[in-house]
């Protein structure tokens, strides 16, 4: 009888931490609610500043003039990279070709800012478990990206949702390394960012790859690291080769 009583006491002791953990996770989910209103307001403000002010006051930088000229020139004749100089990605020039730097371009920039804020918040919240700090990081992000886009860095801005989406999957792995899910999607997202801003995306890929390498070496997950590399390469190639073939055709 005393043995059974001891088992019941141990069972209760084991349940208490579990119930406390569930309660804490529930509280965390409530405190880490997505600051959607903040993201929408900041995205609208940044879009107005970075696109409306340069056009209305004729303050467009040399990079902005060059990018929009490339989009206009594609309507005339020739091909990008061969007949016209271009340092940005193919999808970026395709967007400027379709939108011609007008209202539709502003819509795409606004959507990119909303998606970038969402994925950045989710990444920071996953790594820190602090919704308030993640929200503050989102505010800093919008302040920094205002200066970036105001100087003509539209391509990098449009690549950020893809890069942050990839980083959110990496953050999920770092917080729970018991699974290797999502690495093909990481490759797909990185390829999307590459075809908007190649140089910025390559720098981002190098930093994330170094971080994953250090993490896997520190946790002795050598086989997992090799598998992750193959999965990312597969996802990247699924976007890279068809798009590169189109640009060369």
Give each language-model segment a name.
Residues 111, 117-147, 160-161:
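Transmembrane-helix signature of polytopic, membrane-embedded enzymes
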Residues 203-235:
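Perimembrane helix-loop-helix junctions
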């Amino acid at each position: 009888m005393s043995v059974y009583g001891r088992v019941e006491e141990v069972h209760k002791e084991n349940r208490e931490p579990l119930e406390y953990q569930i309660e804490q996770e529930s509280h965390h989910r409530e405190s880490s609610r997505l600051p959607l209103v903040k993201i929408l307001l900041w995205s609208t403000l940044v879009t107005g500043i970075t696109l409306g002010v340069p056009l209305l006051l004729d303050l467009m930088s040399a990079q902005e003039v060059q990018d929009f000229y490339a989009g206009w020139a594609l309507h005339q004749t020739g091909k990008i990279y061969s007949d016209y100089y271009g340092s940005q990605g193919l999808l970026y020039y395709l967007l400027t070709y379709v939108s011609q730097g007008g209202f539709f371009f502003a819509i795409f920039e606004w959507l990119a800012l909303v998606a970038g804020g969402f994925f950045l918040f989710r990444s920071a919240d996953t790594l820190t478990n602090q919704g308030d700090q993640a929200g503050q990081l989102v505010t800093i992000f919008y302040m920094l990206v205002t200066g970036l886009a105001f100087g003509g860095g539209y391509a990098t801005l449009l690549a950020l949702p893809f890069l942050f989406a990839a980083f959110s999957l990496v953050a999920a792995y770092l917080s729970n390394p018991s699974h290797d899910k999502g690495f093909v999607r990481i490759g797909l997202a990185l390829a999307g960012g590459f075809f908007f801003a190649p140089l910025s995306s390559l720098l981002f890929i190098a930093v994330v790859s170094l971080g994953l390498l250090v993490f896997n070496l520190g946790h002795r997950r050598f086989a997992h690291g090799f598998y992750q590399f193959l999965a990312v390469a597969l996802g990247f190639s699924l976007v890279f080769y068809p798009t590169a073939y189109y640009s060369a055709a």
